[in-house]
Structures are given as structure tokens and as C-alpha cells.
């Protein structure tokens, strides 16, 4: 039986190698921790249908390799992404320091309107923390990002990170800030009736006015 959904969103999971991107994806899709996680080679893919604000949304999620040698390959997957999880490891300042470069790639190669949530992963390793919550919050605020600390091991805030990103995209569609019909938006309608309901006013038929004669 074919899946039915109102919208399809293309998501990216980006950030340096070793930050737990694949484990976040696995926790979100399978609801369990990926014990034998190796570095991603190129890209990995997962999908899940979720309910967000009364709408059924299919998330197509591309988990990209963090190593520099794969950047030319993974960058080709950025195009047409509606949302992204930008991931760093709270126990590794090096992964935090590279966030600006990853964010530039996302906004340049995907879309200037891409919705990004910053995820400080490995929250379960708090005693080994190298990046404070306050510092990361400041980075998120300066770059107009949402922010959560997550744990792929315990599952803390993993679901919320994906859903918060999807919820923001839906709100932007409702407000007219994002147009699903625009090429490269990373958004597709799953139900044809929704497309008709959300046609721009200029495209809808104008009711005839009485002539007054």
C-alpha cells in the first residue's frame, strides 16, 4: 500500500566526521542507538512519515559524510534541501569551530531559505564537554538558527530536532515565506488537493463583480 502524506521535505544532516550524524538518523528512523557506526562514505539515506501540526509529512533525510575527501560528492546532495540538522560534538571544539563553513555550504548550495537547526550531539558525555551550551546558543542566535543539544545514545531531543525543523518549514509555507511550487524548494505536495488549496491568490479565479446596471 502506497504511503500517503500531505508534504514531502528533503532534509540534510551535515557536520564534521565523528559527530554522530548517522547515529542521530538511525535513532530517529529506528528509535534505537546504532552500536556499530562507522564513518559514512558519501551519503546515507533514510525516510520517515511524521505528523506535524495536523499535517502528515514525509521526511527524506540525506546523511552526508563529514570527511573533507567526500565534500565534492556530498555537496551535490545539498541542492533542493528544505531543512538541515547542523551537527557538532559537544566534546570536540574542533567540530564546533567548523560549523561556520558547513553553514555557508548549506546556505550557498541548498537554498538561502533553508531551515537549519543546530544540534550539539553527545549530550550524554557532559563531563567531557568542550563547548558550553551558552556559547553554542550565541552562535545559533547570531546565525538565526534553532538550537538543541541531543544524544543519539539516549534519544534525548532527537525526535524534537527533526520535528522542530519540519514545524518551522510548515509555518513558513502557511505564512507564504516558502513556496512549495518554487523549483529547488525541497518541498513537494503529497496530495493534489493541497496544491489547489494553496495556489497563489493571483492564480485563483476572481469572482465576477455585479455590474450595477
From Swiss-Prot:
Main location: membrane
Matches recorded under InterPro entries: P-loop_NTPase, Rab4, Rab_GTPases_membrane_traffic, Small_GTP-bd, Small_GTPase
Native organism taxonomy: Eukaryota, Metazoa, Chordata, Craniata, Vertebrata
Protein's recorded name: Ras-related protein Rab-4B
Positions of GDP binding: 18-23, 121-122, 124, 152-153
UniProt keyword annotations, A-Z: Acetylation, Cell membrane, Endosome, GTP-binding, Hydrolase, Lipoprotein, Magnesium, Membrane, Metal-binding, Methylation, Nucleotide-binding, Phosphoprotein, Prenylation, Protein transport, Transport
Modified residues (5-glutamyl serotonin): 67
GO cellular component: cytosol; early endosome membrane; insulin-responsive compartment; perinuclear region of cytoplasm; plasma membrane; recycling endosome; secretory granule membrane
Subunit structure and binding partners: Interacts (GTP-bound form) with RUFY1; the interaction allows endosomal tethering and fusion.
Gene assigned in the entry: RAB4B
Residues that bind GTP: 18-23, 37, 39-40, 66, 121-122, 124, 152-153
CDD domains (alphabetical): Rab4
